[in-house]
Amino acid sequence: MDLIQIIVLAIVQGLTEFLPVSSSAHLILFPHLVGWDDQGLAFDVAVHLGTLAAVVWYFRQEVFGMTRDWFASLARRERVGDSRLAWAVILGTIPAGIAGLLFKGFIEEQMRSPLVIAWATIGFGLLLWWSDVVSRRTPQPRDEHSLSWKDILLIGCAQALALIPGTSRSGVTMTAGLLLGLSRSGAARFSFLLSIPIIVLASGLSTLDLVEGEVAVDWTAMGLGVVLSAISAYLCIHFFLKLLERVGMLPFVIYRLILGAVLLVLFSGV
């Protein structure tokens, strides 16, 4: 990988991991447009570690409080502070974890085509638009602390759909949150907290594959990938949460429709 490819792909991954757009669509589109080779598993691990560092650092107070209160709740066998939110993140992760174990092979073999990604980008983009319309009509939107266990499980099941390339994990979890009556910022915050265990699990599995495959590692590329994806992801989270209530989801929906259409034109000759 040359320096330009490292910079572009790391920044793209950092931005698209948390925006309600599809990271897989971008990682297919950019190499196709400029003729780059596949970035490789080691670089994928690096940029995921960068985005993980960004979201953990941004929500460091929440993560610390949830972790502390979760252990305290286990010791006291009662709810303590933010322990319920910690349990919510754990419960919301389970459906995606199960789906990943059951369908990982099928999805990698059958659903990673550019056309699947294009249609998923468009279809789930329209669902995001609909959920935002529903949210605007909700008289008293809730925050992430008010979710019932049923709500959490439904958002977790929605997150499992993100295994379909082109869906966008953040997009589909925000969609579910908005449809369940969360405010835009509440849906986004819970989506970002849910990303932490998912990124940990995905990075762990990829690291195992990397070790077992004895793949040569470009440590300079990995280091740059971690740093650049972390910076871009942190800035993305900050400005997205700052502007979300004002601009809503429509700009991202329009972008997804354009992106999906471009992929269709490039890969099917539409």
UniProtKB/Swiss-Prot annotation:
GO terms for cellular component: plasma membrane. It catalyses: di-trans,octa-cis-undecaprenyl diphosphate + H2O = di-trans,octa-cis-undecaprenyl phosphate + phosphate + H(+). Keywords: Antibiotic resistance, Cell inner membrane, Cell membrane, Cell shape, Cell wall biogenesis/degradation, Hydrolase, Membrane, Peptidoglycan synthesis, Transmembrane, Transmembrane helix. The keyword Transmembrane applies. It is a multi-pass membrane protein. Its EC number is 3.6.1.27. This is Undecaprenyl-diphosphatase 2. The gene is uppP2. One of its GO terms (molecular function) is undecaprenyl-diphosphatase activity.
